[in-house]
């Protein structure tokens, strides 16, 4: 297995003073980038996910267990949203299954951390990865104007990070300058799963180089300057993903849309994210990108 120091990170909702003043994601050195060693685990009902957690110490989630089955309710909630996200993406929307590691279970680790979520790539040949999320989503790092419920914050984080796992079924080792597309897609999907948490709007509102605060910005972020993050820009571009699904497709069913999946299919051929978006609009949806972008 080939290990590389590359990951996708996800911190949205932090105060804008911190959030937009620096890069939110850094490469993790190989010697410290190892899977957490936690004391307990739970396999989800449909046996697609293994949720790892501690029952004591700083990483332990709430151990509330209303149904008395010896599995903390928080852990069961993580498993439920993971399974629901997978069902929606794979069974309903037709995306490829996520690349898995040797045991066939996708691993999610519950930790006390400052990040909303991490999706960490293990193998750039197969695209296998794992996810780390927070154990309670409380504290200033998780303040959000648009998503107030801590359980909902967990749900959008799991949905977001799981879609990153699915994305690598199309391209196991995407170019880092395509981060805007990965994050645009995951922010869009999390909003489908928890539609009352429109947290991508915090980036539209507050990011100085979002497309609405800087209308001359290129749609793929290729003209970002030093200190400006392609991933941050991609969070704000979730609004463009919503625009594409709502304006270019006739379905009223959010999970019946196909345009984002088609972009991923085109992206899997090795073209740039920019070209995959343009090709999909012009070839599969018979429209002009210039018209679409101007209308947006």
Each predicted region: which residue ranges?
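Positively charged n-region of N-terminal signal peptides that target proteins for export
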Residues: 1-5
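Bacterial N-terminal signal peptides
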Residues: 7-17
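Zn2+-dependent metallopeptidase catalytic core
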Residues: 22-49, 55-129, 134-162, 166-170
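Active-site rim elements
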Residues: 72-75, 219-231, 263-267, 278-281
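Surface-exposed patches in mature extracellular/periplasmic domains of secreted proteins
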Residues: 90-108, 172-179, 198-205, 251-272
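Post-HExxH zinc-binding segment in Zn-dependent metallohydrolases
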Residues: 111, 176-225
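Alpha-helical scaffold elements that line and support the substrate/ligand-binding pocket
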Residues: 162-171, 233-254
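Beta/coil-rich, acidic/histidine-enriched accessory regions frequently appended to metallopeptidases
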Residues: 268-296
């Amino acid at each position: 297995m080939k290990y590389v120091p590359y990951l996708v990170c996800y911190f949205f909702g932090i105060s804008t003073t911190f959030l937009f003043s620096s890069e939110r994601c850094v490469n993790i050195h190989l010697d410290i980038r190892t899977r957490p060693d936690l004391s307990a685990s739970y396999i989800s009902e449909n046996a697609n996910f293994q949720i790892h957690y501690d029952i004591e110490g700083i990483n332990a989630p709430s151990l509330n267990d209303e149904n008395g089955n010896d599995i903390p309710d928080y852990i069961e909630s993580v498993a439920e949203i993971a399974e629901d996200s997978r069902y929606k993406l794979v069974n309903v929307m037709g995306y490829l299954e996520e690349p898995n590691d040797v045991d066939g279970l996708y691993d999610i680790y519950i930790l006390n951390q400052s990040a909303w979520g991490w999706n960490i790539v293990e193998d750039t040949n197969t695209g296998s990865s794992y996810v780390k999320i927070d154990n309670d989503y409380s504290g200033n790092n998780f303040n959000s104007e648009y998503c107030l419920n801590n359980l909902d914050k967990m749900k959008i984080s799991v949905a977001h990070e799981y879609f990153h796992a699915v994305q690598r079924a199309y391209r196991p080792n995407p170019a880092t300058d395509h981060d805007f597309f990965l994050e645009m897609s995951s922010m869009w999907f999390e909003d489908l799963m928890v539609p009352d948490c429109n947290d991508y709007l915090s980036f539209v509102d507050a990011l100085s180089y979002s497309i609405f605060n800087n209308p001359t910005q290129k749609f793929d972020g290729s003209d970002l300057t030093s200190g400006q993050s392609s991933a941050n820009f991609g969070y704000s571009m979730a609004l463009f993903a919503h625009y594409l699904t709502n304006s270019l497709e006739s379905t009223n069913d959010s999970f019946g849309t196909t345009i984002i999946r088609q972009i991923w299919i085109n992206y899997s051929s090795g073209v740039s994210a920019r070209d995959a978006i343009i090709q999909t609009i012009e070839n599969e949806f018979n429209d002009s990108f210039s018209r679409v972008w101007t209308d947006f």
